[in-house]
Amino acid sequence: MSALTREQTDRVVAIALDLARDGDTRQLAEFVDHGLPVDAADASGNTLLMLAAYHGHAGTVRALLDRGADPDLRNDRDQSPIAGALFKGADEVVAVLREAGADLDAGTPTARAAADLFGRTHLLAG
């Protein structure tokens, strides 16, 4: 993406962030496969993975992880993708992030604390 101007790059990232929120796995994967950094983030540090996880898109989360997304990158509020998924009740996303080795003790709150708070500790058992 280095051939793009800063404004063009910002626009591509904004589109990709919307694709992550919407769970448009195919199109988002195409963006990443053509050079968009897999850990691209918005101004608040919410990565593509964070937004896909928060909005319950397990397939999109899996596709991003398969392309090298870091499951432990936290946003500017120190929130992790797995804690966000627990907060939103996205059980399948939690399972995908656990399989990817997401750190259950990172962030504020930690995934363990979020699971306890929202009665979802069974998702972290084992």
Spans of features found by a protein language model:
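N-terminal segments that cap or nucleate solenoid repeat domains
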Residues: 2-44
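Conserved ankyrin/ankyrin-like repeat signature
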Residues: 27, 59-60, 92-93, 120-123
